[in-house]
Amino acid sequence: GIDALKSATFRFDRFGLEYVAQELLGRGKAIHDPDDRIAEISRLFHHDKPALAHYNLEDCRLVIEIFDKCHLLSFLCLRSQLTGLELDRYGGSVAAFTNLYIPRLHQAGFVAPNLPHGAIATSPGGYVMNSLPGFYHDVLVLDFKSLYPSIIRTFHIDPLALVHGLQEPEAETIPGYVGGRFSRKHHILPGLIDHLWQAREQAKTEHDQPRSQAIKILMNAFYGVMGSVGCR
C-alpha cells in the first residue's frame, strides 16, 4: 500500500496506516495510542481475542477504503496495461520505457545496443526549488503543462531521431546540445508522446483521474530515463 501511494505521487509526512487513514478517512486504527499498541495487542491476545480480531479487521477495512478513495487499484491496473510491468512492480521506469520503445525501434529496422559493462556515469537531472516565501518580492511562478514531454515532442528528443539526424543534412535537422542533431522525419518518442498526450486529455475530459495520473507519470518518466545508465 505504501509503495502504491508513492507510485501514484501521494505525499504524506508519514506513511503509517494510522497517519494516512486519519488524513484521508478521518479515522484511524482501533488502538490509537502507538506507544501502548504492542502491550494492548498482547493483552487482547491473552484476554480478549474477539477485540483483537476487531482490531485486525479494522486495519483491513482502512486499507481497502484508502485504496477505494485514492483509486489505487485502478491506477495500478492502468499503469500495468500502459507499460507491460507487473501489477506489484514499483518504479521500473527503465523497464517501462524499454517495453514501449524497443518494439518500435525494431519495426524501424534498428537494434538497441547492450548496456556497457560497469557503466557508472550519472546525469545531474533537474533541480526543483521549494517555494519559500520571504526572500524576494514580486516573483512570478510559471507552471508549464507537461514540460518534459513537451520538450521531447517539440525538439524530437529521441534516440532514433539522433541517429538519423547525425547522418542527415544539418539544415534539415533540429539542433541540440554537444553537437547533437535530431531528425525531423525519423523518430519514435514524439509520436508516442503525442498518442499518450491525447489519451490523457481524453481521460481528463472523462474525469478518469487514475488513467490521467498513470499517463502523466509515464510521460514524465521518458525524459529522465534517457539519462539513466540503466537504459539501453
Per-range role (PLM):
Residues 133, 137-138, 144-232:
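Helical catalytic core of nucleic-acid polymerases
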Residues 26-28, 111, 158:
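Short coil/loop linkers at secondary-structure junctions
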Residues 16, 20, 37-40, 51, ...:
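Exposed alpha-helical structural elements
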Residues 29-31, 76, 114, 161:
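A generic structural-conservation signal
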Residues 42-153, 211-232:
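Common nucleic-acid-contacting/processivity interface regions adjacent to the catalytic cores
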Residues 34-35, 118, 165:
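Residue-level "edge-of-site" marker
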Residues 1-60:
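Active-site-proximal helix-loop-helix substrate-binding element of RNase H-like nuclease domains
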Residues 21, 25, 67, 203-204, ...:
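Hydrophobic residues within well-ordered, non-membrane alpha-helices that form the packing/core
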